[in-house]
Structure formats: C-alpha cells, structure tokens
C-alpha cells in the first residue's frame, strides 16, 4: 500500500509507519509522508533528519544536503549534521561546497572522518598531491587513534587508490590485495583490484576477480535478475538500490565489457552489458551509458552520438567521453562538429586530452580543408612516436642482456601502448593519399613503417589492400591476405567478407583458380553449418565474394559472365539481398547501362531478360531493405520511399527498358 499523505496514517502511528517504510527500504513512500508532515511542522528535527536519511538512500544527495543544512542551522551545537551535509555534497559531486563545509568542523571527535572526507574530495578533484598529504597524515596517526595505520585496510585502500591514479598499477594491485586479505572479501575492493589488473593489461586475473564478483552477486541476490535481458526475458527494472551498489555488479559488468572490447570480442562485450541487472534508461549510470554508446556504435550510431553528447553535459562524466566523442566525429568525417566541440570546450581540452590525442585530433580536423598541412602535422607526430619506439626497443634489448624481467615487462607494455598510438597516425597519413588514389605513395608510407608494424594485423591488412588496388601486385597482396585468412581458417566467417573476396580475386588474377575454389567451398560449408542452427540468419560472405568476382569480370568487359555471376550470387533473395550486397550489384548494372548507352557493348535478349527478372525479384524482396545506410547525424534525410532496394531496382529496370528501346 502506498501512503499518499500523512492524513491517511492512523492517529498515533505516524512514527511507526515511517520507520516501517524505512525498514522495508520504501524510501520514496517515506519521503511523501515526511514531506507532507514537514509542511505542517517545518522545524521538526526528527522529521528533517529522517527525510535527509531517505533522500541519501535514494541517492538524491543535493536534497539530503539541503535537509542537513537546515538541521545544522537549527542545531549548530550538533556538528554531526555539518559532517553529514559535507558527505552529501561530496556524493553530489559538489566538491568546492563540500570542502567549505568541512572547514567549519573543528570538533576533535570528527577529525579523522573530516580528514578522510577531505582526502576523498581532493582525490575526486584530481588534486593527487593534496590527497596524498591528507592520507599520509591519517596513516601517521596525527588524526587520532582511530585514524588507522599503514597496514589498516582503509589505509591500504587509500594508498592503493592514489598509486592507481598516479599510474603505478602494479603497486596499487599489491595494496588492494593486502587490503582484501586483511579485511576479507568485499565486492568494491575486489573490483578495485580487478581494475588495477586491467589497467596494467593483466586481463586474466582481472577477469578472475570480476567472475568472483558476478558469481557471488548472483548467488546472494537472485532478485537482481542478472542475465535475464540477454536471454530475452521481459523483466522490471531493479532500480539503483543500495543492495545493487553494494554488490559492485554494475562496475564488474562494465569492466568485463571493456576487457572483451579491448580483446576485440565485440559481441561478447555487447552481451556483457545486457547481462547486468536490468534498469530503465533514465536510471543508468554514466559509465554504463558511455559503454553502451561505444559498443553499439556500429549498429546504432545516431543513438551512440546522442548518449555521448548527453554525457558531456553532465557533471561528472567518464573522463574518456570527451576524447571518444571527438574521435568518433572524425571517424564518421564530421570534422566541423569535432572542431566546434573543441572550440566550445577549451576547458575540457587540457583536462581530458593528452598532448598526443589533441595533436592527432587537430591534424584530423585539418585534413578536411588542408590535407598537405595535415600530413605535415601527422608526420611530426609520427616522428616523435618512432623515436619513442626506437628508444623502447633499445631498452628491451638492454634489459634482455641484463636478464631484468621487470624492466622487460614494463618496456614491452610501454612499447605496445606507443605502437597503438602510432598505427592511427600512420593510417591517417596513408588515407590522405588513398583518397587521392595515389596508391604507390600509400605503399611507400607503409614500407617506411615496416620496422615497427610488420607483426600488426591492422598494418598487414591495409598493406594488402593497397597492393590489391594497384592491380599489378596481386601476388604480393596474397602474401598479406593469406596469413590473415589462415589465422582464422577454423572460423573463417569471422574474417571480413571483403578480405576473402579480395583474396579470391587475387588467386584468380594469378591463375590460382583451385585455391580460389577451395576457399569458396570452405566459406560455403561454414555458412551451411551456421544456417542449420539459425535458418533465418542472413550471411553475406560467399555472396560478397561472388559479387566481387562478378564485378571483376564486368570491369574487364565480360558482362555476360560478370552479370550472370552477380545475379546468381544473390540467390536466395530473402537471405542474400541486403544493403551491402545491393551496393555491389547495382554498381555492375550501372556500369552495364553506361556502356550499353554508349553502344560499346550489346547484350543478347536472354541476358537482358535475366537482368529484368533479377531486378523484379529485388523489387519484390527489397521493400524493407535500405538502399543506402545514411550517415547518423545527416540533417537532410533521403525520402523513405526512395531509400529502398525496391525503388532503386524499379529505377534500374526503367533505365534498361529505355536503353534497349523496349516498351514498358
């Protein structure tokens, strides 16, 4: 039963009813009763105190702080209300206000708690020297007997947090592990340890601690509905309860998703996010919202941009939000938007962007208007990074000579991080010449970087592409495509369809037809096996391979064979016709129509009839298939009636009739 107002509570039972609601965690109902009562008796200390407590439990920290402020004004002799006000302001991320209130507390009994709170505020503000000074004061025992020592669990956690923020992840791991052993299992502490392992790239122990948090959370709180959403079960939101917060389940699932994303297990990362306890979208925390945006960007880019833009207006927001939004704007070529966001948020630039990331974004934005200038900027950045890579290579060699495993590990991690910065710079340089179709220059850029990148999959893939595009280097392209395919041969559908298609074409162009046929049989076999488990699933790999081969023959002028191959590749239409496959098919038809209209080729009636019949099938099956995937933030949308395969296939059919002079 929900209590709407205090008038409905029987006489003499108001206090009992309120305490019963609080006992049952029905804080919203308790707030309704207490608010109504306080309208009649605004100076009730008990009422205000209970209302503040309920607001705090509901995570309405600003409202809780207002109540505690009133209480401290009404009862200045009771300093605990000022302490509670400061704690609520800290939880509301109002750090300057919280700091001001802590300075008003001078009761020695609260000295330790005040110092801890001040240290937490400094830490959250990013003032690490200030936070460390206060933590060391606590550890020294200056704040009193209850301030703990160096081996006290709280002290270990505080030092671990500081070490983590300072980038000393392994030292932080040691502190968190010691705290865990001293205090016994605690979900939040186990999460801290997992996070420190993650940041030091030790994913296996991080996942072990995450699994422990999730397993205990499921066992102790089955009511939180872990995994229900992924299984398609319609469940109610569990809300942002104190119990949910205490389990650290949300944090654990977010960290697991981040690890899977880093390991390029994108589907597992997406499932991990849906495995977490169900909450309504308005209840989601900033980290979950950020991760949802990032991990579903390919499928829902518009929604992803909206979420990241929304987060940028919040205080606080995950520190990665600003950089990720700018990088995604550049990825989707919204350079003007990226420039606007940088200009409007200069204060965030210095706080959230490293000098490397700022310089990289600046060069990417410059690419739009001054590609030559952008190339020079990127070249400067690449030069700086190659110097770092050479220095680290030398460090690793010296450490190996001295058999110093610790230095080897540290230098190797730093080398990997620097290489991950270098690759995007290199690719951005190459893209400038790629857009100009100057493929020899792209190849030259890649060859200059072979010293560092020859084992990097992204580099190898792009070298293969640029060799393939030069048309006289198919044999060299095979040398780069083949290892990528063979590495994933047992799960060949995990390889991009265009990579498989380009490898098949390269085989054909170098008279290795048997290898091409064997690869296509392997793809066909895997597609068949996959369709047994999910008959309705659309799989495009073999279709795209055949389309690219058909396109090759069309490009060589053999339209009879090429168009026939394109048509057959899309059968059956209900499983093979999609936006991507239609893109390849219509290019061949447009090329055919162009050459027919110039009277450069003549098709026999049988092939023309085959083309018309194919387009009629596309018209039938393409009603709900977009002809073009529009850019997520495009202001001028294509008319929905025109952006379908059905519309475009009708248009192509009409053009065929017009070119050959048939009457419709």
UniProtKB/Swiss-Prot annotation:
Keyword field: Cell projection, Cilium, Cilium biogenesis/degradation, Coiled coil, Repeat, TPR repeat
TPR repeat ranges per the UniProt record: 11-44, 45-78, 153-186, 188-220, 393-423, 424-456, 458-491, 543-576
Protein name: Intraflagellar transport protein 70A1
Stored InterPro entries: TPR-like_helical_dom_sf, TPR_rpt, TT30
One record GO biological process: intraciliary anterograde transport
Gene Ontology annotations for the cellular component aspect, listed alphabetically: centrosome; cilium; intraciliary transport particle B
Subunit: Interacts wit the IFT B complex component IFT52.
Major location (coarse): other
Species classification: Eukaryota, Metazoa, Chordata, Craniata, Vertebrata
Organism of this sequence: Mus musculus (Mouse)
GO MF terms, alphabetically ordered: intraciliary transport particle B binding
PROSITE patterns: TPR_REGION
Family membership: Belongs to the TTC30/dfy-1/fleer family.
Organism superkingdom: Eukaryota
SUPFAM superfamilies xrefs: TPR-like
Localization: Cell projection, Cilium
Coiled coil feature spans: 507-534
Keyword check for Oxidoreductase: no
Entry function: Required for polyglutamylation of axonemal tubulin. Plays a role in anterograde intraflagellar transport (IFT), the process by which cilia precursors are transported from the base of the cilium to the site of their incorporation at the tip.
């Amino acid at each position: 039963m929900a209590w709407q107002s205090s008038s409905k509570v029987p006489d003499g039972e108001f206090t009992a009813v309120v305490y019963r609601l609080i006992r049952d965690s029905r804080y919203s109902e308790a707030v309704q009763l207490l608010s109504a009562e306080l309208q009649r008796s605004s100076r009730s200390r008990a009422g205000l105190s209970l209302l503040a407590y309920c607001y705090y439990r509901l995570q309405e920290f600003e409202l809780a702080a207002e109540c505690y402020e009133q209480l401290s004004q009404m009862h200045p002799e009771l300093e605990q209300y000022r302490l509670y006000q400061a704690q609520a302001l800290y939880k509301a991320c109002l750090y300057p206000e919280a700091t001001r209130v802590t300075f008003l507390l001078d009761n020695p009994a609260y000295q330790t708690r005040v110092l801890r709170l001040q240290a937490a505020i400094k830490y959250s503000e990013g003032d690490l020297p200030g936070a460390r000074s206060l933590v060391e004061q606590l550890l020294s025992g200056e704040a009193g007997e209850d301030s703990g020592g160096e081996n006290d669990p709280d002290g270990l956690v505080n030092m671990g947090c500081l070490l983590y923020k300072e980038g000393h992840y392994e030292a932080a791991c040691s502190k968190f592990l010691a705290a865990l052993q001293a205090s016994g299992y605690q979900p939040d502490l186990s999460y801290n340890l997992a996070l420190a392992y993650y940041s030091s790239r030790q994913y296996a122990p991080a996942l072990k601690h995450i699994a422990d948090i999730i397993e205990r959370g499921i066992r102790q709180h089955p009511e939180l509905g872990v995994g229900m959403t992924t299984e398609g079960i319609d469940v109610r939101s569990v809300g942002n309860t104190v119990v949910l917060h205490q389990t650290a389940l949300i944090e654990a699932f977010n960290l697991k998703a981040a690890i899977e994303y880093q390991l390029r297990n994108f589907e597992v990362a997406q499932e991990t996010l849906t495995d977490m306890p169900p909450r309504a979208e308005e209840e989601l925390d900033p980290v979950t919202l950020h991760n949802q945006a990032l991990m579903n960007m390919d499928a829902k880019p518009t929604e992803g941009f909206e979420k990241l833009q929304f987060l940028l207006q919040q205080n606080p927001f995950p520190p990665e939000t600003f950089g990720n939004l700018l990088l995604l704007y550049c990825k989707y070529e919204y350079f003007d938007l990226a420039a606007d966001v940088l200009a409007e948020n200069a204060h965030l630039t210095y706080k959230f962007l490293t000098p490397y990331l700022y310089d990289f974004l600046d060069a990417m934005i410059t690419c739009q208007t001054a590609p030559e200038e952008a190339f020079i900027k990127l070249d400067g950045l690449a030069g700086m990074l190659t110097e770092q890579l050479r220095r680290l290579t030398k460090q690793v060699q010296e450490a190996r000579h001295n058999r110093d495993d610790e230095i080897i590990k540290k230098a190797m991690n730093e080398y990997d991080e620097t290489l991950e910065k270098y690759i995007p710079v290199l690719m951005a340089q190459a893209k400038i010449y790629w857009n100009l179709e100057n493929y020899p220059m792209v190849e030259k850029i890649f060859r200059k970087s072979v010293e560092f990148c020859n084992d990097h999959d992204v580099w190898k893939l792009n070298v293969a592409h640029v060799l393939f595009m030069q048309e006289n280097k198919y044999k060299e392209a095979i040398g780069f495509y083949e290892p990528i395919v063979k590495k994933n041969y047992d799960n060949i559908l995990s390889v991009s369809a265009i990579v498989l298609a380009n490898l098949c074409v390269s085989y054909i162009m170098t008279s290795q037809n048997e290898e091409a046929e064997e690869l296509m049989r392997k793809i066909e076999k895997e597609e068949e096996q996959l369709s047994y488990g999910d008959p309705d699933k659309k799989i495009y790999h073999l279709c795209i391979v055949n389309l690219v081969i058909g396109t090759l023959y069309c490009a060589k002028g053999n339209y009879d064979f090429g168009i026939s191959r394109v048509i057959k590749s899309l059968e059956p239409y209900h499983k093979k016709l999609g936006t991507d496959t239609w893109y390849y098919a219509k290019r061949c038809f447009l090329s055919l129509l162009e050459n027919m209209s110039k009277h450069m080729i003549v098709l026999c009636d049988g092939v023309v009839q085959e083309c018309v019949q194919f387009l009629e099938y596309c018209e039938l099956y393409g009603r709900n298939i977009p002809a073009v995937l529009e850019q997520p933030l495009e202001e001028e949308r294509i008319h929905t009636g025109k952006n379908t395969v059905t519309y475009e296939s009708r248009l192509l059919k009409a053009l065929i009739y017009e070119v050959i002079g048939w009457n419709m």
